[in-house]
Amino acid sequence: SLPRPPMICAGCPYRLFGQIVGKMRSKGKLEAVFGDIGCNTLLHFLNAMDTALAMGASEAKRLGYVLSRPEAASKCLAVLGDGTECHSGMDATRNTIFRNVPGVKVILNNNWTAMTGGQPSPTSPANLAGDPNVFDLNASLKAHGAHVVEVSGYDKKALEKALKKALADAEAGTFTTLVVTGVCIRKMPKDSYGVKMAVDPELCVRCGMCQICPGIEADAEELPFFNNICTGCVSQKQACAQMCPKGAIAPARDQSACGLTSCPDLPVPPETIDLPAVTRGLPPFLSVAIRGVGGQGNLFFGRVLTQLAYLLGYDKQNIVKGETHGM
């Protein structure tokens, strides 16, 4: 078993949505959440997703579920990303509108294909050639006839209100496309990082409600402690502060102070690495399969193995061909 399940990034705009949906599921307000493939798949580990099948498949699954159980229209969600909506999810959106099936579809729009390394998607600021993007996701959805509601992924109260309203409308027979916005933190400018958070020990009741993110943990006294992977929610409305019922968490008054008590001692890497010369005995080709690590893992390990192949001499006397099959 894993020491901990995979997690979305510290400060990810998907996190509050996952927390809200997980809470609704635990209270019995949602009986099924249909997902597809992408960073949103990790919402499963926040108790906020039941299925993950293929790019853009979530709404088609929800549609079939509601057609077979019409009474469940207000008790289920379809969730997918902006990239997979553009990939094939819009077909299901169109089919839902065509068949006049009520319900709620949630598009988590972070403007990038984040799970596989941050490639441009049709919602990115520019295309692969660097040309400015003119595609408008919301306008496209509205052109299909969808009722579109946009809300920030960093606004907990607005998210809760929008979800509650959309589910109530579903019970009344309306199909709502809820677009949750928030740029992938890996694409945010560097100066948006580094907001230091602080907790008021006089107000904190040590309830643990704020500990929803890998950037925050409890110290020896059960007070929230912000570790070195806290991003400050990239200068957006901080999720942990919104989770706190006592208002004990806020950006630190002194942003120049370091919140870490110590820094790890890292060994100094050598300037060069002596490798044994390999000139004989190399097989005619090298084939390595990597499975079960997700898109980003495939990309990372593919690069590592390619570098190792070069170091072993394959760059000089053998052809190196790499194929990465993500997700």
PLM features: residue spans?
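General beta-strand structural signal in soluble alpha/beta enzymes
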Residues: 32-36, 78-79, 105-108, 150-152, ...
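A short, basic/flexible loop-to-alpha-helix module at the beginning of a structural domain
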Residues: 269-285
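Thiamine diphosphate
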Residues: 42-179, 189-190
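Short glycine-rich or small-residue beta-strand-to-loop segments that form or flank ligand, phosphate
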Residues: 7-8, 78-79, 286-293
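Anionic-ligand anchoring segments at beta-strand to alpha-helix junctions in alpha/beta enzyme folds, i.e.
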Residues: 20, 24-59, 289-327
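Phosphate/pyrophosphate-binding active-site segments
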Residues: 1-22, 148-155, 160, 177-181
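Iron-sulfur cluster-binding cysteine motifs and their immediate structural context
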Residues: 205-229, 235-273
